[in-house]
Amino acid sequence: MASPQENSTTLDLIRQHLLDDNVFLEHYCSETETTTLIYSQSSSSSESLDQSFSFEPTLNYATTAQSSNLEVSTFFNNSKTEFDSFEFGTIPNVSAARSSSLKQTSFKERKPSLNIAIPVKQEVVQKVELAPTEKKHYRGVRQRPWGKFAAEIRDPNRKGTRVWLGTFDTAIEAAKAYDRAAYKLRGSKAIVNFPLEVANFKQEFNNEIRPLVNSSRKRVRETVNEEQLVINKEMKIEEERVPTAPLTPSSWSAIWDSGDGKGIFEVPPLSPFGAYSQLVMI
């Protein structure tokens, strides 16, 4: 026998199911107006898990009027064929289906993605204009139209005439050339472009003077030697000359013996005076 608590719980479940299902009540109330309704349900799903599990709740309703009490067994046998086909329907998961359909529709109705190309960053090249450097003017230096630099200096020994020193690639080189020339001409009184480099100019000037002095000494020696050679040559030439015979009486004998005596009178006149140039023989 089942306990009264279990019976009450089963009755509550059956009552809730019957009250919710209006179609089931309309079908069975017409046949059992004055009879006692006994409902029994067996779950097919519970039979697969637990074969022996089944419940047969009974509900006896007393009718007041015309019908008599019917036995439970006769009612169950009559309605067994109808109850066998009855099964609880499973409620489909509407939320999952809706979500999947919404996903599909939203994916289909979704607008195609736009391919937006990122523009390439353009590097702006800024032209930096350098400020023109101040051109320093050097003493004795002039710039030619084609870019070269010319160096000139005035020679005080020649009444200030310009002396050409040459052309240079840079103004500094031309200025140094002017400083060298100014130091050579004026010495320590010269006004130069680079005063700190005067000591270098002194050394260069001294190195240039030494070979000049040596060369001058060599030239003096060479001239002395040449003069001595000339004197010696003249002396040798005089010695090599044949001495002439003097006009003495001893030398006259040879002349008389050799000829008719006319050779002596063919001697040119020795007097510087023209009046006595000719000798008259008497």
From Swiss-Prot:
Expressed in roots, mostly in root tip and lateral root tips. It is found in: Nucleus. GO terms for cellular component: nucleus. Belongs to the ethylene-response factor family. Class 3 subfamily. One of its GO terms (biological process) is defense response. Transcription factor that binds to the GCC-box pathogenesis-related promoter element. Involved in the regulation of gene expression by stress factors and by components of stress signal transduction pathways. Probably acts as a transcriptional activator. This is Ethylene-responsive transcription factor 5. The AP2/ERF domain binds specifically to the 5'-GCCGCC-3' motif. The affinity of this binding is higher if the seventh amino-acid of this domain is basic. Keywords: Activator, DNA-binding, Ethylene signaling pathway, Nucleus, Plant defense, Transcription, Transcription regulation. The gene is ERF5. GO terms for molecular function: DNA-binding transcription factor activity; transcription cis-regulatory region binding. Residues 137-195 bind DNA. SMART domains: AP2. Induction: Induced by ethylene.
